């Protein structure tokens, strides 16, 4: 933890004492509170608020928050949600008044996340607001807003969050709380974070109790917050007031105390305590502190009133009375509450601990980006820890592992809702903060109305909302600011990791959807998390992938790595495991390590509060994850014992992942990226091996996805009650209450804890964690958690540049750590992979997920998750690269790169986000579908083996499933972090620096410059300066469709003054523009500036112009490339049409080409930045930068058309949506739908331009083949109805020419009814590229039925060849998976004889 500070002896009481009956006593533990006795000493003196002296959270016996199994004997309440008392270091608020009160010597602002006990009358979930005790200016917010659409309603009113933000000097300040969950507050306050909650009435209670206990711990506070304490008697030892609701709710909650010497934090803490009491019944989970909610001027927004229930009873006044002492108490209380979490907020007393993830992230990702803004707090959104269940775990924020190691400071995560951050307040690790005074103003200080944390973090400019006005959430992980480890992490909703440098992509928000989908994790959490994530995303760095300990016991101490400060926080896995909140350490600073949205960043954090919480917990706990490793019983042991349970938990987690499927993927992608990031960080390498091994999951993955989804494993025995007291230094899982919840010695952080987690993600995460602080990912055991996505995607680091680059200071990702695939993993039938580490020693083989970041797929498709992207252990997975073998065969095997990448173990692209998938990534469909063991699956495959036809039929089915998984894996590989949506606003303008003075591309509507973001140095971005006058483009916005590989992604647009020199043609010399000039030369004009991820090197028009000679010299190769470009165009247009969008301006100038080479090398090479680069090829961050700086630079691309890069197929991006139209039918407006239903067909078809894009695509075929637009050459065609014969012929230069000619005629059909659709055009192009050829189908005397049989056999043969090709590429490090491989996989995975027949007829081959 931060330093163990002497607390007053009161801490010995430990608020949990009153609930001791719910705890399980373990040797060496206090018989009253069940915390380690050493913890008591640490947690003492609630009365004195010593900012710096907050003790590490006392190890309270973890209460099963979610694991009902664990609850046995642990909590009287059926479920105890982990309560997270986050005590962010005080943030110096822009408003000095907020922190003026130094009188609170212990100004420790604490964010207390607690679950309102179910018993207490809780406001509706909606009603339950999260109270954020921020800098209160004495303003009390109305409780009414507590019910906020935020999604609190979504979340069971189980948790309330008390954010002790910056407390004003006056005790009265405590009174003011703003419910985090009020949306309107959000708007006002820039989205205070709301948290997803899981429904856990008893958990709420326990959380409440913990909160009360925490409050009680601070004797100073206990008087005032008596009611509060009452409500949380179990937790509040000193104030053992039993609140009806609090009593039974002994649920562990993590208390993260950020102590800031002399900071007003203490006051905040005290307020927090009060607030806690106040919210007693509050249901809000602190998991996602939406910036709006928390970050808004905490002081301003509805503070006290927002917590009607117990909160009210406590009354703000009571709080103020004990404010000063209470703060301290709160810190103590937080420590106590941490008992529930068992992590005790890895930096129990450190302010940094306030955000489990922040600390964790910061320390973990210190190397990622030592932004000068370490002060920036992690986003409260970040802390949007995990869903309520996870809450507890996340609640125990783990101090950043590294910083923690270095110092005791607890990183703080602050969420700044408003982009207008008054001043970035360094949020340092707790210890730092403690050392520095509250004045240092943890990032949490309210700046303006937004949390100072965000402002402090300086991320203030980052706005989650695309709208400049929207505040951006900034997660500032300041761990060791003194050490120059100041890192500012933007938590991005989409990236569960949340430490990604890149702004959290919006995808996280989309992932929010995931969240929604997953077991209704809690809208508020999602929302707030999304908000905070989105806000923070811009700053998000690749966090260490949260270790998801998939739902299985988190055996591996995450802290094994030098991260010695493993934040024990999630040791609570017990809670977490049972609550699933323990998903292990989510190292990502993202938010609180919201794994759920993919996190966290990876959307996990947001999208799946439930899941997010796990990662969040994971992040926090991961930091100091040791709790599981702790203990008497290694988690492994527990894993073995509880394999089944783990499986169930896993299944739960997995199931959730599955539910979240695609969204999860994006999350998982982020996680995967994170993992590489992890690897990239130096620590990662250090921890990588050990960590990954320790993180290896021993448990068996549920045999089948559905099983995983549906059944939730019994929560592991009360292992979830790990009150890890993570000393930054010790980084041991203190009190992994799970087995023997004795405090683990710091050595534990070095210990490998094997995770029985089924999700490889966790492994990757683990790797990351190791690098960070050695926190290993935990499994989310809790069935409740099961719904959450485990964040399996965590291991996607390599794929996601965002995550990766932040992961280390830009260290090359460790890449694939050894890709260790256990035989079990590689065996076709083996569902379980052994981690490569011996740790798990579980019966099931472990896959060394950490070794291959992509090892864990969070792929929705279980099959995908077979192996980390690098090695697909499962037969299918491993066979993914099979195609490579036949790279020589036919065009359909064009790309070797893909396999190499994937095979290139480190390849980020391979990040499989389906960690759950990984668990179930079985070779066979049966493995996918069947819940039975691999033995059963294998038995089914081998049954009737004597029949050749039956065996071939089974093989065909296996190939089909394997290819489908390969498609998804390739998507993760090439999309990398791009699946996450990012949002920048004008406040982020100063973060960007041009890498070259010359534009990299001049397109039809804009000039592009390659730039880097100071917050995400590993990734490259394109700064698009629109040429059109500002009034016309001010309303510019990319289509509101999900992120797609071939659609330009708008990461934020705003009006900026741009020097006129930058608007000149790329050929004209430019004055050096080292950074986007905020103070441009005299000549400047207002232009709309768009930040995009894809850095184009030329337009299709440039490509056609530069390749005229090559077309004549090598017509076959050139026209084949044209087919690929057209195929990508069709893919993008098809995606747009699915969402009712018609582009209406398709021309060569609006089609951008981006380098899309993936390095096949095993090293960090896995990411040729081109395609992934924009997204953030995780490991490629290093490579991404080069592409950005060099290859992506304007001159480099076009200059060497025939260079090695030119041999790689470029990625085509559709841009310029100024003329785009959206079909009216796509609106949910019922009235509009009714009116549309009454329109005549000719009106509807005319208004929708149904075949508009098809027609323009036909013209593009002519232009790409160096032919003029036929309607320009033959004007008469426009004046009359023309026939195909009237169109000019295309020269027949290659075997592709006749097919392209026929396709152009079909697309230029004058009658729109006869004109083929874009989907049919896509299939025709696929048929042209990969067959079947004329010779196969033009056999005399064959009936159509016989032809269908022939085509079926042809498809099976091509699939087998593709699998072999991928298999070869997997072991050939010189070759990687290429874009052509992915496109071919898409074709073969969906091919069916009927569609092939139709395409052959259109091509007139039949």
Swiss-Prot record:
SMART domains referenced in this protein's UniProt entry, alphabetically: S_TKc (SM00220)
Protein kinase domain sequence ranges: 978-1329
A GO molecular function held by the record: identical protein binding
Compositionally biased tracts (Polar residues): 660-671, 678-695, 737-746, 754-770, 798-808
Phosphoserine sites (modified residues): 148, 696, 745, 782, 826
GO CC annotation: cytoplasm; cytosol; focal adhesion; nucleus
Record annotation: effect of changing residue 1382 to A: Decreases homodimerization. Abolished interaction with PEAK1. Decreases cell migration
Annotated localization: Cytoplasm; Cell junction, Focal adhesion; Nucleus
Similarity remark: Belongs to the protein kinase superfamily.
Protein name (Swiss-Prot/TrEMBL): Inactive tyrosine-protein kinase PRAG1
Gene that encodes the chain: PRAG1
């Amino acid at each position: 933890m931060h330093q163990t500070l002497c607390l007053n002896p009161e801490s010995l009481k430990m608020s949990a004492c009153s609930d001791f009956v719910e705890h399980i006593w373990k040797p060496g533990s206090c018989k009253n509170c069940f915390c380690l006795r050493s913890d008591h000493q640490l947690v003492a003196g609630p009365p004195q608020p010593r900012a710096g002296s907050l003790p590490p959270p006392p190890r309270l016996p973890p209460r099963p928050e979610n694991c009902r199994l664990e609850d046995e004997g642990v909590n009287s309440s059926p479920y105890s949600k982990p309560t997270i008392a986050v005590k962010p270091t005080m943030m110096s608020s822009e408003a000095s008044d907020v922190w003026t009160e130094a009188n609170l010597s212990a100004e420790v602002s604490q964010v207390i996340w607690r679950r309102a006990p179910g018993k207490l009358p809780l406001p509706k979930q909606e009603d339950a607001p999260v109270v954020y005790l921020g800098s209160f200016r004495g303003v009390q917010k109305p409780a009414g807003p507590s019910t906020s659409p935020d999604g609190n309603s979504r979340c069971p009113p189980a948790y309330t969050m008390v954010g002790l933000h910056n407390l004003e000097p006056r005790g009265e300040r405590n009174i003011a709380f703003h419910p985090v969950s009020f949306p309107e507050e959000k708007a006002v306050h820039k989205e205070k974070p709301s948290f997803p909650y899981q429904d856990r009435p008893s958990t709420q209670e326990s959380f409440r109790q913990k909160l009360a206990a925490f409050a009680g711990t601070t004797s100073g506070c206990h008087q005032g917050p008596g009611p509060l304490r009452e409500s949380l008697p179990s937790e509040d030892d000193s104030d053992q007031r039993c609140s009806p609701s609090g009593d039974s709710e002994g649920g562990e909650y993590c208390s993260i105390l950020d102590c800031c010497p002399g900071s007003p934090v203490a006051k905040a803490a005290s307020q927090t305590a009060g607030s806690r009491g106040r919210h007693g019944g509050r249901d809000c989970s602190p998991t996602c502190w939406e910036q709006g909610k928390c970050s808004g001027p905490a002081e301003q927004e509805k503070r006290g009133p927002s917590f009607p229930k117990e909160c009210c009873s406590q009354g703000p006044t009571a709080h103020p009375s004990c404010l000063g002492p209470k703060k301290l108490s709160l810190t103590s209380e937080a420590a106590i509450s941490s008992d529930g979490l068992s992590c005790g907020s890895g930096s129990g007393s450190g302010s940094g601990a306030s955000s489990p993830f922040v600390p964790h992230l910061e320390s973990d990702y210190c190397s990622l980006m030592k932004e000068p803004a370490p002060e920036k707090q992690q986003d409260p959104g970040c802390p949007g820890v995990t869903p309520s269940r996870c809450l507890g775990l996340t609640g125990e924020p783990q101090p950043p592992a590294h910083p923690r190691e270095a110092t005791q400071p607890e990183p703080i995560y602050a969420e700044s809702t408003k982009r207008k951050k008054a001043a970035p307040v360094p949020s340092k690790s707790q210890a730092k903060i403690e050392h520095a005074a509250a004045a240092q103003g943890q990032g949490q200080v309210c700046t303006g109305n937004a949390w100072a944390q965000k402002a402090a973090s300086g991320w203030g400019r980052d706005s989650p909302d695309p709208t400049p006005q929207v505040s951006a959430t900034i997660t500032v992980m300041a761990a060791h600011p003194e050490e120059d480890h100041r890192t500012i992490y933007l938590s991005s909703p989409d990236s569960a990791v949340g430490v990604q440098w890149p702004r959290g992509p919006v995808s996280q928000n989309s992932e929010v959807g995931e969240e929604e989908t997953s077991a209704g994790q809690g809208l508020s959490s999602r929302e707030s998390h999304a908000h905070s994530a989105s806000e923070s995303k811009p700053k998000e760095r690749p966090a260490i992938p949260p270790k998801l300990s998939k739902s299985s016991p988190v055996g591996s101490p995450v802290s094994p790595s030098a991260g010695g400060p493993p934040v024990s926080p999630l040791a609570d896995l017990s809670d977490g495991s049972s609550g699933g909140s323990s998903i292990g350490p989510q190292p990502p600073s993202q938010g609180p390590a919201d794994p759920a949205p993919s996190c966290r960043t990876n959307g996990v954090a947001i999208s799946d509060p439930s899941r997010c919480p796990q990662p969040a917990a994971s992040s926090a706990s991961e930091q100091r994850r040791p709790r599981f490793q702790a203990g008497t019983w290694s988690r492994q042991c527990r894993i073995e014992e509880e394999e089944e349970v783990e499986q169930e938990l896993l299944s739960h987690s997995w199931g959730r992942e599955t539910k979240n499927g695609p969204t999860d993927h994006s999350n998982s992608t982020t996680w995967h990226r994170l993992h590489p990031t992890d690897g990239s960080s130096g620590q990662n390498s250090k921890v990588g091996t050990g960590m990954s091994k320790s993180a290896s999951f021993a448990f068996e993955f549920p045999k089948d996805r559905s099983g995983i989804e549906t059944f939730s494993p019994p929560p592991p025995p009360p292992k979830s009650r790990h009150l890890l007291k993570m000393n930054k230094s010790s980084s041991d899982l203190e009190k992994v209450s799970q087995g023997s919840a004795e405090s683990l010695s710091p050595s534990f952080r070095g210990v490998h804890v094997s995770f029985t987690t089924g999700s490889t993600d966790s492994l990757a995460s683990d790797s990351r964690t190791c690098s960070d602080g050695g926190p290993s990912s935990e499994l989310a055991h809790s069935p409740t958690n099961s719904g959450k996505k485990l964040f399996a995607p965590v291991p996607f680091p390599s794929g996601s540049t965002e995550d990766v680059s932040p992961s280390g200071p830009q260290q090359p990702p460790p890449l694939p750590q050894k890709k260790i695939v256990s035989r079990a993993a590689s065996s076709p039938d083996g569902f379980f992979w052994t981690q490569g580490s011996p740790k798990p020693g579980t019966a099931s083989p472990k896959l060394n997920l950490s070794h291959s970041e992509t090892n864990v797929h969070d792929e929705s498709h279980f099959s995908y998750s077979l192996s980390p992207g690098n090695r697909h252990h499962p037969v299918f997975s491993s066979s993914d690269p099979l195609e490579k073998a036949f790279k020589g065969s036919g065009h359909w095997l064009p790309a070797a790169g893909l396999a190499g990448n994937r095979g290139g173990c480190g390849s980020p692209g391979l990040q499989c986000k389906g960690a759950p998938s990984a668990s179930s990534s079985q070779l066979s469909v049966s493995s996918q579908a069947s819940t039975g063991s691999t033995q059963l699956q294998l038995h089914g495959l081998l049954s009737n083996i004597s029949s050749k036809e039956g065996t071939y039929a089974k093989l065909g089915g296996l190939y089909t499933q394997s290819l489908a998984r390969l498609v998804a894996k390739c998507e993760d590989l090439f999309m990398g972090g791009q699946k996450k949506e990012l949002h920048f606003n004008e406040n982020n303008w100063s973060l960007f620096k041009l890498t070259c003075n010359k534009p990299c591309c001049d397109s039809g509507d804009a000039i592009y410059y390659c730039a880097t973001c100071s917050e995400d140095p590993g990734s490259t971005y394109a700064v698009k300066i629109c040429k059109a006058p500002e009034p016309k483009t001010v309303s510019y916005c990319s289509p509101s469709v999900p992120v797609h590989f071939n659609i330009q992604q708008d990461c934020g647009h705003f009006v900026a003054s741009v020097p006129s020199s930058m608007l000149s043609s790329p050929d004209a010399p430019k004055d050096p523009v080292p950074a986007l000039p905020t103070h441009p030369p005299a000549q400047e004009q207002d232009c709309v500036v768009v930040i995009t991820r894809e850095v184009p090197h030329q337009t299709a028009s440039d490509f056609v112009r530069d390749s005229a000679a090559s077309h004549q010299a090598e017509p076959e190769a050139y026209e084949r490339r044209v087919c690929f470009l057209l195929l990508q165009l069709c893919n993008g247009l098809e995606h747009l049409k699915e969402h009712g969008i018609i582009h209406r301006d398709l021309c060569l100038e609006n089609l951008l080409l981006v380098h899309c080479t993936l390095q096949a090398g095993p090293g960090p090479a896995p990411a040729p930045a081109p395609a992934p680069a924009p997204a953030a090829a995780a490991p490629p961050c290093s490579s991404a930068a080069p592409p950005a700086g060099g290859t992506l630079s304007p001159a480099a691309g076009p200059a060497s058309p025939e260079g090695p890069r030119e041999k790689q197929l470029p990625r085509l991006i559709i841009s310029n949506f100024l003329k785009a139209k959206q079909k009216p039918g796509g609106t949910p407006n019922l009235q509009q739908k009714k009116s549309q239903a009454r329109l005549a067909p000719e009106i509807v078809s005319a208004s929708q331009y149904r075949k508009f894009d098809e027609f323009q695509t036909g013209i593009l075929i002519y232009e790409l083949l160096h032919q003029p637009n036929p309607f320009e050459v033959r004007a008469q065609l426009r004046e009359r109805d023309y026939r195909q014969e009237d169109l000019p012929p295309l020269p027949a230069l290659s075997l592709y020419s006749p097919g392209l000619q026929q396709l152009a005629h079909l697309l230029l059909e004058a009658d729109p009814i006869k004109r083929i659709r874009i989907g049919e055009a896509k299939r025709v192009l696929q048929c042209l590229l990969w067959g079947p050829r004329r010779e196969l189908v033009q056999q005399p005397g064959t009936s159509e039925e016989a032809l269908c049989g022939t085509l079926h056999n042809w498809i099976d043969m091509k699939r087998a060849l593709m699998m072999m090709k991928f298999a070869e590429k997997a072991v050939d490090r010189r070759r990687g998976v290429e874009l052509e491989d992915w496109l071919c996989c898409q074709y073969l995975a969906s091919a069916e004889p009927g569609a092939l027949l139709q395409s052959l007829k259109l091509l007139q081959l039949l």
